[in-house]
């Protein structure tokens, strides 16, 4: 027992580490002063409290300071005695921030020589300590508040202090093995896409296609500008109609009134309407179909027989060019031999008429359309509704002029040579300067043939917009399915009866369309239900139908009535 007592110092003479664990300090066998064995094994600095030095060097008042020594020391070892003969610690050697204390071990742990043996050092956890952490001798994990503070030696905060913001610093990317890819792959195509490195920003993995975002913003800007252009042109068309007296529905025009009306119709800017429709389609096609549209194939559901690729929009007349009820189309036979139709209207594939009472329901194979978000869908519908208003006003003006008898002769000032006409619209690109009087005339009735050509061009552009939007059949106007049901085409009806019928239909159009749009559930496969949403489109058109015609509204029913009236007037004037 005596030998064991000689190996250990008393509790009052123990170092800070041993005293904090309430253990006797084992002294070195060679000397009685200096570091103890526990601190030597732990490779830690063996420190002693300055109270021990005061006891040794004090001759007066030793009893008073002895009472202070008998008080239990606090955790952290700030008031522990030092070994006799040890040099007094100074402020530079042991600053208050670097006074170390060990983690408390439970009592009865003397089976190990030291709680800070090989298992308690950082050499086991980190065989090769990184430069970001201090040495193991400077670490004091027992003091929790000091360890978690930003100014302690446990956490090296120098990378954070070098930059202005707390987390705006550059990670060490020299060893990326510790940062695997998000899908545990090493594909070089999934490498980190870093932005500008002027401010030493953190390179982040970008999964968003920035080009697609810019394209979407560009499309939104174009649609917004196009909506403004639609509203401006609608106001101009209405002003153009009222400034020239519009269409007189009470009797036939004679004398100067008839010539003025013909001049007004000849200067009607249909080229601007075609250009607006073309811009609307050109903006929508890359947005709705970013991967392109495959050539659809029309399939007959009764025989499952593929009839080949459908003729592109603008090169077919199976839907809207059928102006007669007998199924015969107005083809090349109505054109005069001296004035052939344009090349892009002369090569049409005539569709076979469908049986009475049945609607053509072709299915098409095309690429999947992109789904629009609600703001973009509302912007598209806004442009489309404005375009519907322009078309409705245009067909109303044409219908008003075609209701009157054809003039005996046509003015020579509206005629153009064949080369001029071929150059103006044979290229297939709409010309905004194209006027109604520049269309190919006929010797007998130039207004009728020009109106027929204008209707063909306008309905082609309208049908292309409907196909791009993928509207259901009940929301279309340029196809057979969108024609009004029960339209009267009797040749014996006079102008007054037709006018009364159109007026009554216009009055009841809002209620009838609102009911039909609310109850209809017919949606084409891959149509508006996927691109925009049939319910959203019906809600917009239902609101449009509730607006009065004096406000430029009326909805799809008014446009259908105007289209049917123009077709009926053309059949009567051209004896079809």
From Swiss-Prot:
Subcellular location, record wording: Nucleus
Q: What's one Pfam family here?
A: Zn_clus
List every stretch annotated Disordered.
47-123, 334-369, 404-424
List UniProt keywords, sorted A-Z: DNA-binding, Metal-binding, Nucleus, Transcription, Transcription regulation, Zinc
The Swiss-Prot or TrEMBL record marks DNA binding at 15-46
By its UniProt entry, which SUPFAM superfamilies does this protein fall under? Zn2/Cys6 DNA-binding domain
Compositional bias segments (type: Low complexity)? 95-109
* The keyword Transcription is annotated on this UniProt entry: yes
Can you supply one Gene Ontology CC term for this chain's record? nucleus
Q: Where is the composition biased (Polar residues)?
A: 47-61
The molecular function terms in GO held by this entry are: DNA binding; DNA-binding transcription factor activity, RNA polymerase II-specific; zinc ion binding
What is the documented function of this protein? Transcription factor; part of the gene cluster that mediates the biosynthesis of macrophasetins, 3-decalinoyltetramic acids (DTAs) which feature a tetramate (pyrrolidine-2,4-dione) unit connected to a decalin fragment and that have potent bioactivities.
Annotated protein name in UniProt = Zn(2)-C6 fungal-type transcription factor mpsE
């Amino acid at each position: 027992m005596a030998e064991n007592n000689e190996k250990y110092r008393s509790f009052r003479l123990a170092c800070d580490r041993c005293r904090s664990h309430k253990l006797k300090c084992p002294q070195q066998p060679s000397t009685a002063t200096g570091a103890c064995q526990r601190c030597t094994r732990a490779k830690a600095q063996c420190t002693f409290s300055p109270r021990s030095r005061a006891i040794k060097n004090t001759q007066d008042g030793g009893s008073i300071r002895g009472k202070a020594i008998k008080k239990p020391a606090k955790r952290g070892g700030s008031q522990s005695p030092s070994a006799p003969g040890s040099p007094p610690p100074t402020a530079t050697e042991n600053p208050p921030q670097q006074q170390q204390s060990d983690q408390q071990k439970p009592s009865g742990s003397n089976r190990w020589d030291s709680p800070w043996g090989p298992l308690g050092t950082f050499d086991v956890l980190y065989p090769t300590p990184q430069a970001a952490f201090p040495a193991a001798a400077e670490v004091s994990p027992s003091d929790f508040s000091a360890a978690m503070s930003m100014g302690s030696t446990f956490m090296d905060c120098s990378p954070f202090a070098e930059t202005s913001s707390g987390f705006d610093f550059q990670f060490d990317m020299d060893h990326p093995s510790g940062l695997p890819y998000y899908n545990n792959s090493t594909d070089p195509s999934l490498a980190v896409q870093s932005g500008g490195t002027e401010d030493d920003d953190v390179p982040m993995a970008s999964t968003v296609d920035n080009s697609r975002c810019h394209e979407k913003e560009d499309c939104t800007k174009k649609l917004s500008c196009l909506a403004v252009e639609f509203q401006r042109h609608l106001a101009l068309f209405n002003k153009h109609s009222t400034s020239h007296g519009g269409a007189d529905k009470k009797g036939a025009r004679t004398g100067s009134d008839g010539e003025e009306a013909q001049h007004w119709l000849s200067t009607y800017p249909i080229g601007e309407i075609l250009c607006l429709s073309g811009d609307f389609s050109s903006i929508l096609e890359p947005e709705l179909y970013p991967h392109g549209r495959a050539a659809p194939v029309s399939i007959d559901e009764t025989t499952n027989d593929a009839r080949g690729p459908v003729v592109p929009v603008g090169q077919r007349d199976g839907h809207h060019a059928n102006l007669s009820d007998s199924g015969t189309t107005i083809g090349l036979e109505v054109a005069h031999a001296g004035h052939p139709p344009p090349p892009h209207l002369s090569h049409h594939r005539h569709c076979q008429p469908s049986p009475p009472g049945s609607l053509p329901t072709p299915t098409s194979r095309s690429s999947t359309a992109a789904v629009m978000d609600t703001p973009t869908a509302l912007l598209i519908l806004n442009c489309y509704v404005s375009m519907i208003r322009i078309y409705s006003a245009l067909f109303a003006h044409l219908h008003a002029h075609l209701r009157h008898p054809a003039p005996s002769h046509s003015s020579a000032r509206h005629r153009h040579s064949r080369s001029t006409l071929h150059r103006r619209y044979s290229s297939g690109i709409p010309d905004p300067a194209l006027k109604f009087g520049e269309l190919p005339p006929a010797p007998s009735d130039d207004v009728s043939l020009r109106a027929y050509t204008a209707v063909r061009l306008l309905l082609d552009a309208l049908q292309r917009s409907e196909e791009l939007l993928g509207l259901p059949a009940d929301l279309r106007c340029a196809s057979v399915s969108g024609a009004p049901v029960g339209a009267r085409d009797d040749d014996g009806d006079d102008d007054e009866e037709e006018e009364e019928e159109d007026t009554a239909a216009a009055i009841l159009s809002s209620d009838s369309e609102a009911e039909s749009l609310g109850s209809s559930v017919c949606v084409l496969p891959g149509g508006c239900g996927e691109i925009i949403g049939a319910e959203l489109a019906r809600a917009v058109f239902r609101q449009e139908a509730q607006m009065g015609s004096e406000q430029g509204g009326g909805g799809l029913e008014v446009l259908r009535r105007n289209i049917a009236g123009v077709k009926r007037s053309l059949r009567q004037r051209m004896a079809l």
